[in-house]
Amino acid sequence: MKDFIKMTLATMAGLFIFGIAALFIFIGMVGAMASLGSSQPVMPREGVLQIDMSAMTLTEQTKEADPFATLSGAEMVSPVGIYSAINAINAAATDPAVKFIYMKPDGATGGIAQIEEFRTALKHFRNSGKAIVSYIENPSNASYYLASVSDKIYMTSYEGGMSMFNGLSSQMIFLKDILDRLGVNVQLIRHGKYKSAGEMYIRNSASKENLEQNEAMINSVWDSWAKEIAASREISVEDLNLMINNLELNFPSDFLEKGLVDELLTREELQAKLCDIYVAERFEDIKAIQLPDYAQLKSTVNLKAKKKVAVIYAEGNIVDGDEKQQVAGDRFANIISKVRKDSTVKAVVLRVNSPGGSVLASEKIKAELDLIRQRGVPVIASYGDYAASGGYWISANCDKIYTNATTLTGSIGVFSMIPDISGTLENKLHVNITPVNSNRHADMYGMMRPLDKAETDYMQASVEVIYDTFTALVAAGRGMTVPAVDEIAQGRVWTGAEALQIGLVDEIGTIEDAIRYAALSIDGITDVSQVQIAEYPKPLTTIEMLMESFGAGESVFAGSSLENVEKAFKGWTSSESGKVYARMPYEISIR
């Protein structure tokens, strides 16, 4: 018996030591893998700035690349923050070492407004007198939109490619029929005839108002893109739409015939063409640097500057609590409070890329931003893909609001949802519930019965008060009357271009424009390089991303047509019963 105990203890000790050793080895491997991309890139004395959109992804903040991606067979994709990308392209315009930009736009990923900001930077580069050359093989809406800014667009001569340059489409999902089959009844309480968040759970098709705003939104976004494309290619918007509507852009020869590309080339012919532009005898003699590397070299972090512009990134759903992956009310309020107490911060840029969420969390964030403004520090808003509902709530009081033309904003309205799952339990699962309450309405949020009239009126009153608060704060922030705000509110989603016309924003501009404006508003500052750009919250490190990933597995529906359905169910289940939300009804993905 003693020998058995000794052997057991020895085995346990061995396993413990092995586990500790394995942990240290694993941490060492992670550190080594993370350091692979940490070496400082080198800019050739004279070279080409290469932009391969399939090898990078536009993000709000520059993050570390996932070092484990290559282990799964995937290619390493570099996340590049949109401000970092814009800053790099602007630097290249005046850098004598950069001769021209060579861009491969196929595989472009990023939000719709991020892509607009990126193209705007490319347009400024071209206006500086330097050339942009693009080569496309499988044009999509996003890739051709980017390519169209180029001086020369070359396209593969292979006629077997696939064109997906066919305009924008939005698909709205409705779950009422399946919820009926499951025995689930969702009660939606809202204010705003356009506030369609929650409609997917109570209808099997779009309401008239929802369809109206969706059509207006898609057409406004496409109109912005089509005008830019048409202007760059010196054709009319009408002719461009005619080509697309008549499916006249199928093969590379079609693009050439219609004047949308300049020449069809094989890869070998492309290499020869690049040699001519670069003035090189062989393709191998062309020196190039990738945009993510160049962005790292041209980072504008001036640690010696005594004055700071704090850039606060509010990206994701606005939620209660302090979780890291969303715009958590308590966490962001604490971050903004620290910024407020930093006497070296002389201006703040609030970068909003959020469809909204919790009203309580939104108000906490707004309150802290108001305290910064009360200190005499200007707060400038910059809108990304979304600045809607709660995203607009937190920024309506900012001293100046920049938006992209394709940003989705507004959605000034509120709603609450309470599902009743008693039918599922009793009729489908044969589970019976007997409530025991201390008071008459104690179980009204329990989801085990429908609300009665008194409870519905109670919830509606709460929604009405919050809607009135929302419109009042917008009126105060934008210098409008409450009735004027109510007329353009009602939960209606507007594009940035539309929002400018109705007074919800001040100017069409990028995050770079917002940061420049904030910097120049500081006494004694005449150039952005004179201030330190401090970003909040700090991006997650590789180790932190690894720890986060342990609790967040990839969706089994990722990449499939069911992914949007899964998101819809998650949107419902993540909304706490009875809480009031200021959230946009949908999110848009452009390909």
How would you describe each model-predicted region?
Residues 231-232, 262-306, 415, 471-477, ...:
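C-terminal long alpha-helix characteristic of the crotonase
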Residues 176-273, 422-502, 506-522, 526-528:
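Charged, glycine-interspersed solvent-exposed loop segments at helix/strand-loop junctions
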Residues 359-364, 498-501, 545-549:
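Short glycine/threonine-rich loop-to-helix capping motif typified by GTGT followed
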Residues 40-42, 49-175, 301-424:
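Cleft-lining beta-strand/loop regions that shape enzyme active-site pockets
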Residues 2-42, 46:
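N-terminal type II signal-anchor transmembrane helix
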Residues 313-316, 352-354, 381-385, 405-407, ...:
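Active-site proximal loops enriched in glycine and acidic residues that flank catalytic Cys/His/Asp
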Residues 304-344, 462, 536-591:
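Intrinsic disorder and flexible/low-complexity segments
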Residues 5-8, 12, 214, 332, ...:
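Hydrophobic alpha-helical elements at and bordering transmembrane segments
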